[in-house]
């Protein structure tokens, strides 16, 4: 195969990889396409969940199940095949035993000594790396951050008006953004190991924090149903017992991170309804966010979407814990008293910039996302 032919196949592998979002942590999302020398796709697969078979193995099994011999085929995979025996055997062994002739991958394994490119080459396999590397790096950004820093990747999402208001200042007002932009939020939830809000958002909006509007209806049968862990930062355990998050805690995971001195009786009441209350240290104004990050890392949450109100967004930004920010922008201008700004801070200056921003249009709304770099 020529390098020009690898791009579309790698793009398909990336599409497959995303289907595993929300279930693979602490492993990455990985997709694989097996193709013959004449360009016929004989097998596809993706890593569905931690502890399960890796994408390459799934694709090999799919090829054999379809009556195809993978010997001599090319494996197009989003991440360099692993050469380490952890929860599953090395993918290099499966590929070599299958007689695959060529392996094309997007991104090198960041774990020193665990990538399998050299072993594959030693076994006579033609290996090419770096195909659509930027796209793969973008998809795997939370996982890469986790394995290189040991801390979960915090992706903050806000919805705001043109003048930076996240509420309209009056109860019962409609959503800031329309259904197309909200569908993007559901896609981001679907990719994430966890979704986080503060107690203020729970009290104001009574969110459910589930994935409902993704994938598209016509693709629904091809995607496994996935719901992220729902996380609430609630120093004093103010979350109501009849909140939708609590009512559904028996069937969907809910972690409530509370201060060490939060009421024990309230913890028992919440636990009785299925929520898990996790005690963490407190700081000057609430939970110690570094301790929160450490606890989530201990629980192998590689990345989370933070649907932040002004208080939580400000606290995370000031703590240096915002890695990516997605802003949904509605074509409205709201000056009503009580309409809250994106950030609430007494600091004389809080600035940041979005690195390599990506803009998109969703119905009447716009979205911009980028990695966060503190300015000033």
Segments (PLM) and residue ranges:
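Proteins enriched for Cys/Gly/acidic motifs involved in redox and nucleic-acid/cofactor modification
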Residues: 23-26, 51-52, 117, 126, ...
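Helix-turn-helix
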Residues: 31
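Short capping loops/turns at secondary-structure boundaries
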Residues: 84, 88, 129-132, 147-151, ...
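Zn2+-dependent cytidine deaminase-like catalytic core
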Residues: 34-135, 255
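Generic structural signal for helix capping and beta-alpha/helix-loop junctions
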Residues: 112-113, 137, 313, 334
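Active-site beta-strand termini and strand-to-loop segments that position acidic
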Residues: 36-37, 148-149, 371-373
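Enzymes that bind and transform nitrogen-containing heteroaromatic metabolites
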Residues: 2-28, 43-44, 153-155, 160-376
